[in-house]
């Protein structure tokens, strides 16, 4: 992988932006234009894996399909380089995670402005049959005027794309605090998966913390499947009923009970008088049988399950406890 100061073709690496299991991301400069760019270098050993190779090509296809301010365009693809890399449009803005670290609970109007702008971008993606599947504060940039950008389409899905893992045997595709129940269960996800993440994010903007969290990732995922978060109106006064109802519907465990897509969520945000307030008192039954807290907190148990894959881990744990 390159280092700051290195030149790759006609790009100069200026600073690291992040690193994941399959790629390292840097800010750079295009020497031809002088403009800042983002360079995403893929681990060539990972590209030998069919799943990583397919995701690389999905990201290229999706980047070329989406044309809207707030979504980074793919400017260049160097598949034959060593290591292979993409060049993406550089997006200005402050990470939503950084904003929340400075001010964990946002004023209600600001939270609604951010989530509405974000949901509108996601709705555009859904219109193009693209599902991000990893929406979280780290992947959202907010400018001083409140405009929003979405970054990192690395695990995004284009509807109809071939499956790259066995059904039910998917690895961790997403971030535990922001994963939808269907992702945890090894499903591919779709528009309702992004809707669930939008509900989680709005909850966090208003409550000051994610609805589900634990030092143990398996415990966090189990909470998504079976636990109910503390109601927003008990955490903080002054939250309108329609906002709490929108969050409740977006976060329903069963995807068919959520908003159909981000466009329907935007419509609810724009027309609060049409929001069904009965959602506030509607139960959301667990998706699996109760799991012993002592068991899921046992490090040896968790370690063994992670070895067989995240989605399978949750299902195996549930099966063991039903015996």
Please describe what each predicted stretch is.
Residues 14-20, 25:
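Protein kinase glycine-rich loop
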Residues 175-277:
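C-terminal lobe helix-coil module of Hanks-type protein kinase domains
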Residues 43-65:
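AlphaC helix of the eukaryotic protein kinase fold
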Residues 77:
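Activation-segment/catalytic-loop signature of the eukaryotic protein kinase fold
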